[in-house]
Amino acid sequence: VGAEQTRRWESGALAHGVTDPFGQGPLPWLRGADQYFGDTGLMVPWYVDPALLPAARRSPDYDPKPALGRPRTSDDVGGQIKGFAAGATDLGGSLDLRVSVNPPQEFTVDVYRIGHYGGAGARHMAASPRVSGLVQPAPLVAGRTVSCHHWWMSWRLQVPLHWTPGAYVAVLTTADHRHRSHIPFTVRAGRAADLLLLLPDVTWQAYNLYPEDGRTGASLYHAWNEKGELLGEPAAATTVSFDRPYAGAGLPLHIGHAYDFIRWAERYGYDLAYANATDLHAGRVDPTRYRGLIFPGHDEYWSAPMRRAVERARDGGTSLVFLSANTMYWQVQLHQGPAGEPDRLLTCSKRQAETPASVLWRDLGEPEQQLMGIQYSGRVPEPVPMVVHNTDHWVWEGTGLRDGEEIPALVAGESDRYFPRVPLPESTERVLLAHSPYKDVRGVGRHQETSLYRAASGAHVFASGTFAWSPALDRPGHTDERVQRATANLLDRICKVH
């Protein structure tokens, strides 16, 4: 492959089926001078190669060669170090890491927990000894489905009982300190909490193009042909495997949204439990035990068991907080993997010539709006202001906002709105908190809306209708105190602080 193509794949952020202006976000253990440009304080996401930036935006001390002691991100062409794990475990449980190292050499694992931690963004929790590394077998390919379930276990992480449940990242570093990669995972808790945060690992896997090598990789959006050309959805995979690394840096494309919310929520002391969407699907967590469920980021792919569990929770009085857009758009199925482990394959037969029937929830007679109060409308080419409405509502209390005022760049990525001809959920109260005009990629005028309703059970259901809400809570360069206050008003009401 050409050098220019290789550089694109190094980022792990090829053009997927969605424009996400926030993506993976900055991570604290990757901070360095080459991530800040000029005197403006503008932060460029850590996964962007400075060599590809205009010279005017590079740091004055930018060196095209990685500094000694500062590893580069592994890529899927060289596969210098890549790994994956099951995705979640319990306190007192264990997690098996399967890692490939090319060329073979020892490597280390550093485990971090995402949180505020006085502004640090994460805390170092554990470090492995040096682990023997080997080149694992090539991924197995069946049709467009790529799986590494046959990789050998490299290292087992024992999770102590005294750790705090949460979102964790295992950082893999080669012994020569030249390359680094990541394995995200979740530590669940047996105890109840006020709020259950559900990390959207089903959607993360739908977008995973591993390996981004110009030949083998496939997601539900893309695949390559024999010429190395990237193909679109009609030729993409219909089934993808959880048993493989994430492309590029080893982190899901949209993971930064969840990390933004976690840092903010833990800073202000909200009582959180953690689980993955696959846990919700499998019934490993009971959402009715919580006052509220938090969906912190892009959460597009839902199975029927996921939706039914959330509907039951709402009808039992559990509030729902959707902090992104394009939620619950596609219906998917989860199946056991080749080794018999449950829920290791994700299937969504969308936009395929041989399967013309739609698998959109709205086309199956269950539009998203029936649960969330609004539903997906379209992509937002460039961030635009959110125009607030009904500012006398308690959600906007203390923000200082008045009807018609704007919150800059808060509508971004994708948007939701209310569809008048689509059934609404039963409610005792309902309000639209924003109505924001924008133009789509064809220049056609559209609008975004933010919704809140109260179910007969007393549950509040909030939907932000934009990708930019979570980043406004704790993303450097994107925070907005009014969004922070509105979110606090919502969660305080759900947690019955008042």
Feature locations, PLM:
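Proline/serine/threonine-rich low-complexity linkers at boundaries of modular beta-sandwich domains
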Residues: 17-79
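Ligand-binding face of N-terminal immunoglobulin V-set domains in extracellular IgSF glycoproteins
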Residues: 81-106, 110-117, 122-185
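Aromatic-Pro/Gly-enriched surface loop or interdomain linker
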Residues: 104-129, 177-287
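Helical hinge/lid and interdomain linker segments adjacent to catalytic or ligand-binding clefts
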Residues: 134-149, 154-158, 164, 250-336
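Structural motif
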Residues: 169, 196, 291-296, 321, ...
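Active-site rim elements
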Residues: 249-252, 356-367, 470-480
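Extracellular low-complexity, Gly/Ser/Thr-rich intrinsically disordered linkers
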Residues: 265-267, 417, 425-498
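An acidic, glycine-rich "communication" segment
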Residues: 328-443
